[in-house]
Design a protein with these regions (language model features):
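Conserved beta-strand hairpin/beta-sheet module of binuclear metal-dependent hydrolase folds
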Residues: 1-62, 164-179
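Core dinuclear metal-dependent hydrolase active-site scaffold
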Residues: 18-23, 29, 38, 132-170
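Metallo-beta-lactamase
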Residues: 52-73, 101-154, 201-222, 250
């Protein structure tokens, strides 16, 4: 009921807080950071209405360490946006945080940026510019490595500087990590937005979110569209440590 319009009250859904490792010869990136080591403290920074029940798992840093990953390979964490459940795990990652100017400003001043301000203190904030052309229907882009393997596209709407991250693998597979344009694959498959109240509470510009959602829906036959919080959306992506990492894995 609360994920998309038209849901049933008794529907039960698992919401994920995830991080995705994308490897590249010129340096690796994490897309978002999931839950962190100081999760309880981060939850206390939230308004009570936003304190949903959660299950604690291993942090992205713990999972990287468990497989012997060399963290010095990380260029940083590329955040789809700075809401708490996407940045909490930055608390144990001393690496640059990649974000847009609009998102940095939002995170530094908005009430929804309290956890971001806590975990980003003392860390490098690496802003990137919209220096590339429209990309797959989105109005502007930034090519991280200059080879089309990781392209960030301007989305906005959920937050002022929220983005979609497109990853193209050597196999030809393509993924679109759409952040919170929708929380569940139902939003893509049923072309369904969030319920009205959730749009009011969660989005800074619900109309722009709808535009981004429609753009994502149009790509679903050529791109694996991955809403951040739908566990099943990550099924095609190997879990870190389960197979040799080649291009991307989810901690």
């Amino acid at each position: 009921m609360f994920a998309v319009t038209g849901g049933r009250f008794r529907d039960r859904r698992r919401f994920a807080a995830t991080s995705v490792l994308v490897q590249h010869p010129d340096g690796d990136l994490l897309i978002d950071a999931g839950f962190g080591a100081h999760l309880d403290e981060h939850v206390r920074l939230l308004p009570r209405i936003e304190r949903a029940p959660f299950e604690r798992g291993r942090t992205v840093r713990e999972q990287l360490d468990a497989v012997g990953y060399d963290v010095s390979r990380l260029l940083g964490v590329l955040v789809t946006h700075v809401h708490w459940d996407h940045v909490s795990g930055l608390d144990s990652l001393d690496v640059p945080i990649w974000l847009t100017r609009e998102e940095r400003e939002y995170g530094s001043t908005d009430s929804h940026g309290a956890v971001f301000r806590a975990v980003s203190a003392g860390r490098e904030l690496r802003e990137y510019a919209w220096d590339g052309p429209p990309y797959l229907g989105f109005p502007a882009s930034h090519d991280v490595h200059g080879d089309g393997s990781v392209v960030v596209a301007r989305a906005g709407g959920h937050t002022p500087g929220s983005v979609v991250v497109f990853v193209s693998l050597p196999t030809g597979e393509r993924y679109g990590f759409i952040g919170d344009l929708t929380w569940q694959l139902d939003g893509i498959e049923r072309r369904a937005a969030r319920p009205w109240l959730l749009r009011r509470l969660a989005d800074v510009d619900a109309d722009l979110v709808r535009t981004g959602l429609d753009r994502s829906i149009a790509l679903r036959d050529v791109v694996h569209v991955v809403p951040s919080h739908d566990v099943s959306a990550y099924d095609p992506i190997p879990v870190l440590g389960s197979t040799p990492v080649q291009g991307g894995a989810r901690p």
